Amino acid sequence: MKKSRSFLLTSLQQAFRMALAAKENTNIPFDEFIESQEYQALSRRNFLRQTTQAVTAGATASIIIPSIQGWAQNRMPKIAIVGAGLGGLNCGHHLKKAGINFTIYEASRRTNGRMMSVKGALAGGTWTEFGGEFIDTDHTEMHQLAKELNLLKLDVDAESERKLTKDLFFFDNKHYTVKQVIQEFLPFANKIKADQESLSDEIDYLHPNNKDFDNLSIDGYLEKIGLTGWLATMLKVAFTGEYGLDTGVQSSLNFLELFSPDTGKRHNKFELFGKSDERYKIIGGNDQIPTKLGEILKDHIVFDSKLVEIQEPKAGGYILKFDGKPEIKADILVLALPFTMLREVQLKKLNIPEWKRRSIAYMGYGTNSKLMMGFQRRQWRSQGYLGFLYHPEVHTGWDNSQLQNNNEGECGYSIFLGGEGGKNLGLNDAEKYLNIIESAFPGTKALHNNKRRIMNWAQNPFSKGSYSCYTTGQWTGIGFAEGIPVGNLYFAGEHASIEFQGFMNGAAQTGRTVAEEIIKKVKA
């Protein structure tokens, strides 16, 4: 089961699970049941889900194409890593610790990929995450790297924050409570659960089961079950922000898998309160992790190296051609760049199977963007809110400077959009979103300090998208083929992860696991 990365979707997941539980506890009045569950939720904050997909290794191991080209015993293989984002850097980091040489080729003039922390962008003494922002409790790769690099973490679930209301749902010009969301789910809970339970245990390109759901969009599914009104709008907003593409093009399996109320079918336990908690940030900026890795690996990185072609000669190995630079040869190749960029590389002379070509060519990518604005103070906190806002035109809004400077003085606020809204978001939209924030938290607009920044990852020439997203037909057409190696060709990055696809943790995880595979191969 995939994990949520957005606050709204996490809240909706929990509301749906509580609606199912309420229907199964008909002997308890609804209000009394909800109150009891809210109490349990508070008492169980430290028992968040630690899911792992143990079957993943076994499922992929059987279809990994074995190495077809060795190298001479009297020399170490030449290893090339393309991409100096977190996946490529963590791969290099583990290779270096194992005493194995390599070179990282990066198209831009910076490391870090889609992680970018900017100091003082919106307010003095603050930092703002222009890219990957939140770290879950079970993002073990990120926690381990932070510990290894002596970086401290900010806990946004600190005691001071629990005293305020976290979420403000603002739809149809009304404020909705979580209790109302649960009530709205009740008529549809059993139907959604039945559809989820009808899903096969394995759905991917090797096991193209449940094509009917895969070929149906989320919009089509909601219409099919008769779910309309403000709850349908809220769900569409949640999934557009979550995956980064409009729900009219997303596979309904994105909805059915992520909203599963019965994780026991695949993970041997029922988790009513299991969720992505988005609890941590690195103090001073998340990009300190890849920045520090880049400093450790500085003698291994070559910048301004845009890959334009990969060839695989009959004699073995790989030939990499770069724009305006000499070609290089490698025995082992790690591609740690998003498929949005890899599909621009000439691969006709690379010996890879058709399923891998389809994955590279067609995998969907979100168009998430952030509009970030500065304010003189946190008006939302004075009104009893942490600042999280959900609105038909705001897929998620939040205080991006939460807990910085003890929540005092100037601050920043992020508007997060996906789909066509994210694709087209620009600084000229600031006035529109200032008015929306004002409608939710009156008095905020007058406190705007006129500092505004934009990060549109779909328009960034080195990413051309935010993170991976399966569109209709892609679960069964190319699903989970991204990270499978082909001979001595490996893939790393968030898109190559199964459990943590779309997360920083997925990039770090795949970088490490690819390095471990190479280490075993080299030292065998």
Task: Go through the PLM ranges and name each one.
Residues K96-V118:
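Glycine-rich FAD pyrophosphate-binding loop
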Residues Q40, N46-A72:
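N-terminal export signals
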Residues M341-Y467:
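C-terminal segments that line or cap access tunnels to active or ligand-binding sites in enzymes
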Residues L20, D31, D204-E309, P313-G317, ...:
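Active-site/ligand-binding neighborhood in enzyme catalytic cores
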Residues A123-E197:
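Dinucleotide-binding Rossmann-like beta1-alpha1 core, especially the glycine-rich loop
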Residues G324-I332:
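Core beta-strand elements of the Rossmann-like FAD/NAD(P) dinucleotide-binding domain
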Residues P77-I104:
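N-terminal Rossmann-like FAD-binding beta1-loop-alpha1 element of flavoenzymes
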